[in-house]
């Protein structure tokens, strides 16, 4: 459908029907919805792979879900999904295909970009990664002095850091504990300093992740890491090849840096940064958990990819989650979405989802460049339970904002905990189930009074309830389950972007600040080459204050 013939989203009959339905619902009460539908707790569930999804505690009825599915059909979600899986260039502003799904396709799959099957190239890189990972894990890969590598420092930023750093924390119990793995992303020199300060350079390998090998933060950190290595080893440039590998496509720049291009692992333009950690960007993770477990993770991704591609709308988990997000964002004016994993190993999971969701759907123009008249991506936030319960849950329970939330938990703890720590898992999960119940059903003034609470305190101890949550429960946290979870959220984000008619796969919003930083840096250092007159009065005054504080 071309721009001239496309009806604006909020003018479609399906949107109008949802708006009318929302008005008729008024202020839905979950207590009443459950009372009217005794089997709601089992009827409103889905199963995808190892994931059990309970969406019964949402402010929806069968009619709501039907109307939301009609909106998805009218906005071409299924058609755009098929175009993505076919390798069409649905990232229109960059004229690129969007094929992170090809990164986890089986060897015999056929996925074409510009008439070429990309799956053999994907598996060639995976095989190369596996060979390298086994060399490091077995001690065959040695540094310049002949010592085996024991420390790996991954240097990247954005998708080249958040994904592998998150997955390493999630799968820490599956890692080789004899290897130390650290991640550096911030151009603040303190990040690199703390990462290497107690490492033996003779036993340290740096993994430099930059598709173009020109990302300013990454190359600045990589250059400083190279200086540290050569200074500490008191050796020349030839040592670099034994202590640095590259995740890049720019062989010329990689070789210029001193890295042997035989140790360059490539990926492709059709892989967006925030969708890339299951590509070569995941090399450091593969070294940590081993190639077999990395492939288990890819199989988990692929399982949900196939579910998203083939499951009917009524049973399609990513479609459902995406539609629920549209329901709250566009018809309840919810501004944020909390992701609350009840697993310490998922401590970086929500930060990863922040980039996945907010960089994808933080857009204010549609695919045709026209301003949108509806809310798009939410603010995504959250930390692991039970910590959040003693921090911000107060606002969710008794504040004035509607904050839909996802609760993620596991029936079994990780396998290597001490017996006493394993016993704590039931307490953790008791909190997990209690919070969704409390958020949904609250506590009425009558229930508070029945406990003998003084009347003046009754309003303070009343819980309104009706806070919507999705519960995602799995047997245990494994590499496959991690892949399933990430793919679930990837495709949820896709669904919402398709409905909102935005390009979920570009990120022009990160560019302006980078351009301005290049102009401002010479003003800070006094190296010249910049015109202070280009600055607004506030920024100019701040630059002057900075220079004064630095004694310049």
From Swiss-Prot:
Main localization category: cytoplasm
InterPro entries hit by this protein: G6P_Isomerase, G6P_Isomerase_C, Phosphoglucose_isomerase_CS, SIS_dom_sf, SIS_PGI_1, SIS_PGI_2
Keywords: Cytoplasm, Gluconeogenesis, Glycolysis, Isomerase
GO CC term, one of those recorded: cytosol
EC identifiers of the protein: 5.3.1.9
Molecular function (Gene Ontology), one example: glucose-6-phosphate isomerase activity
CDD domains (alphabetical): SIS_PGI_1, SIS_PGI_2
Gene3D superfamilies, A to Z: 1.10.1390.10, Glucose-6-phosphate isomerase like protein, domain 1
SUPFAM superfamilies referenced in this protein's UniProt entry, alphabetically: SIS domain (SSF53697)
Gene Ontology biological process terms in this record: gluconeogenesis; glucose 6-phosphate metabolic process; glycolytic process
Annotated localization: Cytoplasm
Enzyme class at the top of the EC tree: isomerase
Annotated catalysed reactions: alpha-D-glucose 6-phosphate = beta-D-fructose 6-phosphate
Family according to the record: Belongs to the GPI family.
Family matches, as PANTHER family: GLUCOSE-6-PHOSPHATE ISOMERASE
HAMAP family cross-referenced by the UniProt entry: G6P_isomerase (MF_00473)
Function summary: Catalyzes the reversible isomerization of glucose-6-phosphate to fructose-6-phosphate.
Name used for this protein in its record: Glucose-6-phosphate isomerase
Classification lineage: Bacteria, Bacillati, Actinomycetota, Actinomycetes, Kitasatosporales
């Amino acid at each position: 459908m071309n721009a001239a013939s496309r009806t604006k989203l909020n003018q479609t009959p399906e949107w109008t029907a949802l708006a009318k339905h929302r008005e008729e619902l008024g202020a839905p009460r979950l207590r009443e919805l459950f009372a009217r539908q005794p089997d709601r707790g089992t009827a409103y569930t889905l199963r995808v792979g190892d994931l059990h999804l309970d969406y019964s505690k949402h402010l929806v009825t069968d009619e709501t879900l039907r109307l939301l599915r009609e909106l998805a059909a009218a906005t071409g979600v299924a058609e755009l999904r098929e175009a993505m899986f076919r390798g069409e260039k649905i990232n229109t502003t960059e004229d690129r295909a969007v094929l992170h799904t090809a990164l986890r396709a089986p060897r015999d799959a056929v996925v074409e970009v510009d008439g070429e099957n990309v799956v053999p190239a994907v598996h060639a890189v995976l095989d190369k990664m596996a060979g390298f990972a086994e060399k490091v894990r077995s001690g065959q890969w040695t540094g310049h002095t002949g010592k085996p590598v024991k420390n790996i420092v991954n240097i990247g930023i954005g998708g080249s850091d958040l994904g592998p750093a998150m997955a390493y924390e999630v799968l820490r119990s599956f890692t080789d504990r004899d290897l130390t793995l650290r991640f550096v992303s911030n151009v603040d020199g303190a990040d690199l300093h703390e990462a290497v300060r107690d490492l033996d350079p003779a036993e340290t390998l740096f993994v430099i992740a930059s598709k173009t090998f020109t990302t300013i933060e990454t190359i600045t950190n990589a250059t400083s890491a190279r200086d540290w290595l050569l200074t500490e080893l008191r050796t020349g440039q030839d040592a670099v090849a034994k202590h640095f590998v590259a995740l890049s496509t720019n062989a010329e720049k990689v070789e210029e840096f001193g890295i042997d291009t035989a140790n360059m692992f490539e990926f492709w333009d059709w892989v967006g940064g925030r969708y890339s950690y299951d590509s070569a960007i995941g090399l450091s993770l593969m070294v940590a958990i081993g190639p077999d477990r990395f492939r288990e993770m890819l199989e988990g991704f692929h399982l949900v990819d196939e579910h998203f591609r083939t499951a009917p709308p009524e049973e399609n988990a990513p479609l459902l989650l995406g539609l629920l997000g549209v329901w709250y964002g566009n018809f309840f004016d919810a501004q944020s979405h909390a992701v609350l994993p009840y697993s310490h190993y998922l401590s970086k999971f929500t930060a990863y989802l922040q980039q996945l969701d907010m960089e994808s759907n933080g857009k204010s123009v549609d695919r045709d460049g026209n301003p949108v008249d509806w809310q798009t991506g939410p603010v995504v936030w959250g930390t692991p339970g039970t910590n959040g319960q003693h921090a911000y849950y107060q606002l969710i329970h008794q504040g004035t904002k509607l904050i839909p939330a996802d609760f993620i938990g596991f029936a079994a703890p990780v396998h290597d905990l001490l017996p006493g720590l394993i016993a704590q898992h039931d307490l953790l999960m008791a909190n997990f189930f209690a919070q969704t119940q409390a958020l949904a059903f609250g506590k009425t003034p009558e229930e508070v009074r029945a406990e003998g609470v003084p009347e003046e305190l009754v309003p303070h101890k009343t819980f309104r309830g009706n806070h919507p949550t999705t519960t995602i429960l799995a047997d245990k946290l494994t590499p496959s389950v991690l892949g399933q979870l990430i793919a679930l959220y990837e495709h949820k984000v896709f669904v919402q972007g398709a409905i909102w008619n935005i390009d979920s796969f570009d990120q022009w919003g990160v560019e302006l600040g980078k351009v301005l930083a290049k102009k401002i840096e010479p003003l800070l250092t006094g190296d010249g080459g910049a015109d202070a007159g280009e600055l607004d009065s506030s920024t100019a005054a701040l630059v002057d204050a900075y220079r004064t504080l630095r004694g310049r």
